[in-house]
C-alpha cells in the first residue's frame, strides 16, 4: 500500500515497550469492544466459589498476557508485512480479553497474577524466536497456542458455577474469538505442529495454570 507507514527498528522497540506496559500495568489496556458481561446480573457467590472463579479468571488473564507477548514478539521479527500485520491485529483483539478478565477479577475482589511479568518475558522471547525462524512457524505457534487456550476455556466453562453468568459470558466470547484466531493463522499458511510439539506446549501451559491459580 502506498500510504503504509514504515517503522524503524527503534520505533518498533519503543512500540513493544509501550505494548508491554499497557499489558502489565493495571487497567491500562482499553478494550475495543464492551465486555460481554455487561447486562448480565451480578450473582452473590459464596466465598469458596468466588475464590475459585477468581482463580480461573486469573489463569485466563495470564493466558491473555502470554498471548499479547507472543504476538508482539512475533510482530517484531516477522519477515512479511502481511504476517506482521496479522500478529498486530491479533494482539489488538486480545486486548479486549485482557481487559474483560481483569475487570471480572476486580469484581470478584481479587487481583491478577504476580507472575505476569515473568510469563510476558518468556512468551515474548518465544514469539520473537518463532518469527526469526520463519513466518510459517510463527503462524503455527499462533494456531497451536490458541488451541491450548480453547481447551482451557472449555474446561473452565465446565467448572464455573451455573449462577455466574458474567464470567460465563466473557469466556464464551473469548472461546469464539480464540478459535477464529487459530483458523485464520492456519489459513494464512501456518504450520500444523506435530503431536510431540503440542505435548510440550501442554506441559508448559500446565505450569502456567497451576502457578497462576493462586499466585
Swiss-Prot record:
> How many cofactor units bind, and how?
Binds 2 iron ions per subunit.
Identify the residues that bind Fe cation 2: 94, 146, 178, 181
Query: HAMAP family annotated for this entry?
Result: COQ7
Q: What is its main location?
A: membrane
Query: Subcellular location, in the record's words?
Result: Cell membrane
Give Gene Ontology CC terms. plasma membrane
What EC number(s) does its UniProt record assign?
1.14.99.60
Swiss-Prot/TrEMBL keywords? Cell membrane, Iron, Membrane, Metal-binding, Monooxygenase, Oxidoreductase, Ubiquinone biosynthesis
Q: Which cofactor does it need?
A: Fe cation
What protein does this entry describe? 3-demethoxyubiquinol 3-hydroxylase
Note the superkingdom of the native organism. Answer: Bacteria
Where Fe cation 1 binds, per the record, is at 64, 94, 97, 178
Q: How does it sit in the membrane?
A: Peripheral membrane protein
Enzyme class name: oxidoreductase
Q: Which gene encodes it?
A: coq7
The Swiss-Prot or TrEMBL record describes its family as follows: Belongs to the COQ7 family.
Q: In which pathway does it act?
A: Cofactor biosynthesis; ubiquinone biosynthesis
**Could you tell me what reaction this enzyme catalyses?**
a 5-methoxy-2-methyl-3-(all-trans-polyprenyl)benzene-1,4-diol + AH2 + O2 = a 3-demethylubiquinol + A + H2O
Q: Which PANTHER family does the UniProt entry name for this protein?
A: 5-DEMETHOXYUBIQUINONE HYDROXYLASE, MITOCHONDRIAL (PTHR11237:SF4), COENZYME Q10 BIOSYNTHESIS PROTEIN 7 (PTHR11237)
Question: In this record, what's one Pfam family?
Answer: COQ7
State the Gene Ontology BP annotations: ubiquinone biosynthetic process
Molecular-function GO term, any one: 3-demethoxyubiquinol 3-hydroxylase activity
Concerning InterPro entries, the annotation shows: COQ7_proteobact (IPR047809), Ferritin-like (IPR012347), Ferritin-like_SF (IPR009078), Ubq_synth_Coq7 (IPR011566)
Q: What does this protein do?
A: Catalyzes the hydroxylation of 2-nonaprenyl-3-methyl-6-methoxy-1,4-benzoquinol during ubiquinone biosynthesis.
Amino acid at each position: 500500500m502506498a500510504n503504509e507507514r514504515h517503522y524503524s527498528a527503534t520505533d518498533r522497540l519503543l512500540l513493544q515497550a509501550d505494548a508491554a506496559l499497557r499489558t502489565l500495568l493495571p487497567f491500562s489496556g482499553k478494550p475495543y469492544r464492551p465486555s460481554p458481561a455487561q447486562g448480565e446480573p451480578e450473582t452473590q457467590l459464596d466465598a469458596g466459589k468466588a475464590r475459585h472463579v477468581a482463580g480461573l479468571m486469573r489463569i485466563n488473564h495470564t493466558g491473555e498476557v502470554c498471548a499479547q507477548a507472543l504476538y508482539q514478539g512475533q510482530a517484531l521479527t516477522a519477515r512479511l508485512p502481511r504476517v506482521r500485520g496479522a500478529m498486530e491485529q491479533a494482539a489488538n483483539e486480545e486486548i479486549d480479553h485482557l481487559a474483560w478478565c481483569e475487570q471480572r477479577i476486580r469484581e470478584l475482589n481479587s487481583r491478577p497474577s504476580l507472575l505476569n511479568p515473568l510469563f510476558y518475558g518468556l512468551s515474548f522471547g518465544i514469539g520473537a524466536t518463532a518469527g526469526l525462524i520463519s513466518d510459517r512457524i510463527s503462524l503455527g505457534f499462533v494456531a497451536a497456542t490458541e488451541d491450548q487456550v480453547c481447551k482451557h476455556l472449555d474446561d473452565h466453562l465446565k467448572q464455573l458455577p451455573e449462577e455466574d453468568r458474567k464470567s460465563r459470558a466473557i469466556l464464551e466470547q473469548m472461546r469464539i474469538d480464540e478459535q477464529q484466531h487459530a483458523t485464520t493463522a492456519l489459513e494464512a499458511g501456518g504450520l500444523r505442529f506435530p503431536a510431540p510439539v503440542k505435548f510440550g506446549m501442554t506441559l508448559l501451559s500446565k505450569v502456567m495454570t497451576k502457578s497462576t491459580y493462586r499466585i
